[in-house]
Every structure is written in C-alpha cells, then in structure tokens.
Regions:
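Cytoplasmic membrane-interface "Motif A"-like loop-to-helix N-cap segments
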Residues: 81-97
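Intracellular juxtamembrane helix-capping segments at the cytosolic ends
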Residues: 130-145
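Helix-loop boundary and gating motifs at the non-cytosolic
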Residues: 5-67, 254-262
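Glycine-rich segments within core transmembrane alpha-helices of 12-TM secondary carriers
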Residues: 153-179
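Juxtamembrane intracellular "pre-TM" segments in multi-pass secondary transporters
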Residues: 2-16, 219-260
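C-terminal ends and interior cores of transmembrane alpha-helices
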Residues: 92-113
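Central cavity-lining transmembrane alpha-helices of secondary-active solute carriers
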Residues: 56-81, 100-101, 168
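Helix-loop junctions on the cytosolic side of multi-pass membrane transporters
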Residues: 142, 178, 211-229
Length: 263
C-alpha cells in the first residue's frame, strides 16, 4: 500500500481556529467536571441527601460511567470519523451536546431531589467533551506535516491550559469569590445556587464562542488521503485503531504522543 501523503501546510488562521476549540473545551471541563459544578453538587445540592450513598460517592459513580462510555466508544468513533465530512459532523454534534448539557446545569437548584439530574448532566457533558476530542485530534492530520505536528499540537495544549486558567479566574472573580448573600463582581445571589448556575451559562457560552471558529472553517481544511465511508463493527473499530496507531507511529511519532497525552 502507498504511504499516505502528508497534508500540505495551512494558514495560521486555521491553526488558531483549531487551537481555540481546545481553549473552550478544557475550560469547560475545568469548571463543570473538576472545580465548580461538581463541588456545587456534592457540597450544596446534595446536602441533606437521605440514603446510604453520599453525594461524593454518587459523583464518583457518575464520572466512572462517563469514563467507561468514552473508553468503549472512543476507538469506534476514531475509525468512523476518518472521512473528513464525518469528522466535521461528529465534532459539531458532540460540541453542541456538550454546550447544551452545560447550559442545562443552570437548572439544577439547591435541593437533593436535583442531585441525580445534576450528576447525569455532568456525566453527559464530560462524555461528550471527551468524545468530541476524537474528531478534534484527528483534524491535526489535516493541519500539519510530520515536521509541524509537534509545534501545532503544542499550541493546542497551551491554548487549553490558558483557557482553563482564564475561565476559572472569570468564574471565581465574577460569580464565586467573596462572602455574604451575593458573590463576585457581578453580585449574583447565593440563594438557591444562582451564582453557580449563572456561571454555568457563562461556561457554556465560553465553549460555544471558542468552538465556533473551528466549526465554521473545518470544511476548508485540506482533506488528507484517508479511507472513505465504510461500515465498521465495534471489534473492527478497535482492530483498525491499532493498525492506524502502528502506521502513524512509523509516519509521525509526535502525533501519536499528542494523541496519548490528550486521551
């Protein structure tokens, strides 16, 4: 079989659009999964929960379900999105689901009856965001050559780091910091979790804003010489993934390193 030709170099604007998606996605995960919404669920919404399981243990189960879902579906997703148009559609759908589920977390009130719904939305957001990274990472092959993949992937990683720090600062300063009945520079009421719920809307808007440039320009990326549409079984997806990783290791090890770090 012929080796796949390297993708031609692309303009800076397309690389920036690609990196901005990571800026939005990593920020969303930091707020929803790690630092703000998860703490709101276990420390506020779940207080007074009756029954044997604690809010923290229920959170662990929700994250385990999300992680298992990603572990099962990510390899198959990676094979199914090898065709560039499928890649774009999958990225748009999964990004949209992550934005919508994050927006819906603003409906979770300070009441133990809302805990299960909140955990379900958190798990859905985490799973969709992680699965969206599969077509996102695959787009790197359309943007880079073996010589530039390390630099471009590093830019994406840096954008994600900066995005998470910037959004954390925005949410803390604007909605969380301080004491009393209102919090943050915007003075949002703490009662019924309004300050955290407002921060979730800002987080959803953040991801949507930074994802938009990539979603609008992905169709202009140079199509790499990759397999077209085909039906693949779950086991076939894992087999194809292993074959692709071995082939990519021979072609461009920097890209494989980036995919492993992003996993």
């Amino acid at each position: 079989a012929r080796p796949r030709p390297a993708s031609p170099p692309v303009g800076r604007s397309k690389v920036v659009a690609w990196a901005l998606w990571d800026c939005g996605s990593t920020g969303l995960n930091a707020i929803v999964v790690t630092f703000v919404f998860s703490v709101y669920l276990t420390g506020t919404v779940g207080q007074g929960l009756t029954g044997g399981a604690s809010p923290a243990s229920l959170l662990g189960r929700a994250l385990a379900i999300a992680g298992l879902t990603v572990a099962v579906l990510a390899p198959l997703t990676g094979v199914l999105v090898q065709a560039p148009h499928r890649r774009r559609v999958a990225l748009a759908v999964l990004t949209g689901l992550a934005v919508l589920s994050t927006s819906a977390t603003s409906l979770i009130r300070v009441d133990p009856e809302y805990l299960v719904a909140g955990l379900a939305l958190l798990a859905l957001t985490a799973a969709c965001s992680d699965l969206a990274s599969v077509p996102y990472n695959a787009m790197l092959r359309q943007l880079s050559t073996p010589e530039t993949s390390g630099r471009i992937s590093g830019l994406g990683w840096a954008a994600g780091y900066v995005g998470s720090v910037a959004l954390l600062l925005l949410v803390y300063v604007g909605f969380i910091g301080g004491s009393g009945p209102t919090r943050g520079l915007f003075g949002v009421a703490v009662q019924d979790g309004h300050n955290v719920r407002a921060a979730m809307l800002v987080t959803a808007a953040w991801f949507a804003l930074f994802a938009l440039p990539l979603l609008l320009t992905a169709h202009t990326f140079a199509p790499a010489a990759e397999p077209g549409d085909r039906r693949v079984s779950l086991l076939g997806g894992y087999s194809q993934l292993w074959s692709d990783l071995r082939a990519e290791w021979q072609r461009d090890r920097n890209l494989v390193y980036f995919l492993l770090v992003s996993a």
